[in-house]
Amino acid sequence: MEKMNKGFTVWFTGLSGAGKSTISHLLKEKLKEFGRDVEILDDDVVRTNLCQDLGFSEQDSDITIQRIAFICKLLTRNGVAVISAAISPYREARDKARNEIGNFVEVYVKCPLEVCVERDAKGLYKKSFKGEIHSFTGVSHPYEEPQNPELILETNKENVEESTNKIIKKLIELGYLNTKEDVYSSEEEGMIIKRLSGLGYIN
């Protein structure tokens, strides 16, 4: 099977409020335009459905990432384009996910902490500052920036459309997507040309 017909995982990492979920949903729509089956594993949804027993400590965070990576691996093996949108603050856990999944594209959604705090749509930073959430990344726990991600998006400097287009371009460069101008295989092109020739449209 050619690489571009295989599944892959786009693994977003970054602080809460950096824009991971917002970009994920636009990316999903764009990937569908390429004819791909797409699934999103959003941090909030995963915590609600698979990780109700876990908090925000380093150990709990690692377990959350292990569970997400396992699901990503299964979906990727079955040809799905998977989008993981979780903070995943620790480098070692992300590297383990990369090794387990295989077709792995790490995207660092980079945004200054003060901008994330201003956005704070979920109110998590506010709760963290009040002490209602312990071990919260960026406040009481560290975030380890990726050393060699496939892509860095600076969401305080670019809009969602620009960020998403950068991801699509990278996926094409890596061979996971065809360009839209090249949607037919050589065999399919031959059949189309033969049919058009038989109908008298081309000589």
Language-model segments: which ranges?
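Hydrophobic anchor at the beta1->P-loop junction of P-loop NTPases
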Residues: F12
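Conserved lysine of the Walker
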Residues: K20
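Short acidic, low-complexity intrinsically disordered linear motifs used
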Residues: E187-N203
